[in-house]
Amino acid sequence: MIEKLIFDLSREGRKGYSLSGNDIPELSIETVLPAKFLRTEPADLPEVPESEVVRHFIRLSNMNYHVDKNMYPLGSCTMKYNPKVNDAACDLAGFSELHPLQPEKTVQGALQMMYELSGMLAEIAGMSAVTLQPAAGAHGELTGILLIKKYHEARGSKRSKLLVVDSAHGTNPASAAIAGYEIISVSSNADGRTDLGDLKAKLDGEVAALMLTNPNTIGLFEKDILTIAQMVHENGSLLYMDGANMNALLGITRPGDMGFDVVHYNLHKSFSAPHGGGGPGSGPVGVCEKLIPYLPVPVIERIETPEGSSFRLNTDHPESIGRMMNFYGNFSVLIRAYTYIRMLGATGLRRVSENAIINANYLLSRLDSRYDLPYPKPVLHEFCLSGDRQKKAHGVKTLDIAKRLLDYGYHAPTIYFPLIVSEALMIEPTETETRETLDLFAEALLCIADEAENSPDLLRSAPVNTPVKRLDEAQASRQLNICCQG
């Protein structure tokens, strides 16, 4: 049953509450605001009693899907369960009641937390320094690319090209384009990894950097990464790592040890902050030693004196690329990531990645007999199936499979990405799911594979059990109607 809009529940004269009389004289708004700021007709606001308001939003919340409700298999999104202790740390008055314009001496605890988090992230990825400013992954990409650009400019080199592997997230070429680079695509080989021959052919004196995700979006580790790093560096270029898939690497290996010069982290993914509703995110950037002078300001520094240590925000970095956002990053996500890392420690972080890898390979082993596997096993933290078999044999597309999963009570996985996989189904179970949960999800996909053979029309009309049935997504994206007509 479709829930009505709050405006449709409105009835004239109904009120949620009313205020008792008081002895404060009533003031006419016309005497306070100029006429140009006043409405010419009453606002079209809903008139609904409190009980109906509460029930309306409770009903909507029950229809919502979130990681606290069930497994959230979005590939390349790392929708892990977020420990509630992280939220408790955020709610501490010493954090929640701060204002970013307070004097430094009154926010020493917050500065210490950010300073220590930067150090921990640098150690985890094997980088020399980290900035916490970027607001999310794509913002981190842009920050990293601007650092690369500044590095080349400081050396008198006006390089104009940036290489991006064809399996990359779409934000990679977008971020590079915003920074002013020409995007050159590097092909993947038959194994789903970077084609070294194509990379060699495209490396020239105009290439500023190669952007690479490791493991890549198919869930495969770039086993030739040391060779790739050598090729890039011998060309005078830098190597950038999209850290979207770092949940596979924690405590096992480090991007800095692979030869990456820049890496961004997605704290909301690998380091556990809620992001299913679209944010907030956090995309810190780690750099090698030679890029430190260009980091965004202000830089958090620790000062040692005979009286003890303190922390400050230093803007005196003349080679810096400047600020990447107001203030110091998405602070609440930084607190959650700090708490998560402190709770787990080095051993716990390694177990996170080990269990993520185990879960992905177990789930793949349950599914690869009924869905096509475009590239060979094993994978790391996620995998990519193809619905080509169902499409060719029964006319059932990956979109139909994803829609049918909604009827089984699951959020759909990422579909039609990466672009190098036809009819792609991209699944990332994360480390926080039990074997029983994985089995239930696998059974749903196996049942859907049976339905594709025996009841293809059911899949083509799915979902059939959800409050809202299949939408015309093309029309919805082209003819927006987001206003309520009173």
From Swiss-Prot:
Entry's Gene Ontology BP terms: glycine decarboxylation via glycine cleavage system
SUPFAM superfamilies: PLP-dependent transferases
CDD domains tied to this protein: GDC-P
Domain of life: Bacteria
Pfam families in the record: Aminotran_5, GcvP2_C
Gene Ontology molecular function: glycine binding; glycine dehydrogenase (decarboxylating) activity; pyridoxal phosphate binding
Broad class of enzyme this protein falls into: oxidoreductase
InterPro entries: Aminotrans_V_dom, GcvPB, GDC-P_C, GDC_P, PyrdxlP-dep_Trfase, PyrdxlP-dep_Trfase_major, PyrdxlP-dep_Trfase_small
Oxidoreductase in keyword set: yes
Gene3D superfamilies membership: 6.20.440.10, Aspartate Aminotransferase, domain 1 (3.90.1150.10), Type I PLP-dependent aspartate aminotransferase-like (Major domain) (3.40.640.10)
Keywords: Oxidoreductase, Pyridoxal phosphate
N6-(pyridoxal phosphate)lysine PTM positions: 269
Cofactors that this protein relies on: pyridoxal 5'-phosphate
Catalytic activity: N(6)-[(R)-lipoyl]-L-lysyl-[glycine-cleavage complex H protein] + glycine + H(+) = N(6)-[(R)-S(8)-aminomethyldihydrolipoyl]-L-lysyl-[glycine-cleavage complex H protein] + CO2
Enzyme Commission no: 1.4.4.2
Record-level GO cellular component terms: cytosol; glycine cleavage complex
Family note: Belongs to the GcvP family. C-terminal subunit subfamily.
Assembly: The glycine cleavage system is composed of four proteins: P, T, L and H. In this organism, the P 'protein' is a heterodimer of two subunits.
Function, as annotated: The glycine cleavage system catalyzes the degradation of glycine. The P protein binds the alpha-amino group of glycine through its pyridoxal phosphate cofactor; CO(2) is released and the remaining methylamine moiety is then transferred to the lipoamide cofactor of the H protein.
Protein's UniProt name: Probable glycine dehydrogenase (decarboxylating) subunit 2
